[in-house]
């Protein structure tokens, strides 16, 4: 934000206002891109976290505004530790809605059905990793559906030539 760019500062404002209808929105990109320690999220009562926005991003050395508007990724595709971030949020007691706030030039040009499937896979991945890290049973999570088809296959590696 222009005047408040640290979630801890935002939380202090909410505390001082002491209003039942005022809370905070946590945005993983804004917290992690600025290098803020997310552990203090656990000091915010879950009922005072009103919304959660998630995005991953590659480690880039550039202006945060440009980075934010053009290079966000789905969870698990960047360098942010979203598993730890989400763990802090859940330990705070948050059980409300979340959104993927992924601003990315490539996704803007991609078929929306493919992008939605990609988003769902990333959330399933994040739920699985977060449950494993917390030692929770993954039995309570919906099992992954068997694939019906493949739209594309992507390989990454070195020396893939003949």
Label each PLM-derived region with a short phrase:
Residues 4-26, 32-162:
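Histidine-acidic metal/acid-base catalytic patches
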């Amino acid at each position: 934000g222009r005047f408040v760019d640290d979630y801890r500062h935002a939380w202090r404002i909410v505390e001082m206002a002491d209003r039942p209808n005022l809370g905070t929105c946590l945005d993983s990109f804004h917290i992690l891109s600025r290098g803020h320690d997310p552990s203090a999220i656990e000091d915010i009562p879950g009922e005072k976290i009103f919304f959660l926005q998630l995005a991953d991003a590659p480690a880039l050395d550039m202006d945060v505004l440009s980075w934010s508007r053009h290079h966000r990724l789905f969870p698990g595709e960047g360098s942010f530790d979203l598993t730890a971030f989400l763990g802090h949020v859940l330990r705070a007691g948050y059980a409300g809605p979340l959104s993927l706030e992924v601003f990315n030039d490539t996704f803007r040009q991609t078929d929306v059905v493919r992008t939605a499937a990609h988003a769902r896979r990333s959330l399933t991945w994040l739920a699985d990793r977060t449950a494993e890290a917390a030692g929770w049973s993954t039995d309570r999570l919906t099992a992954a559906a068997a694939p019906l088809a493949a739209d594309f296959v992507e390989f990454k590696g070195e020396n893939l030539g003949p």
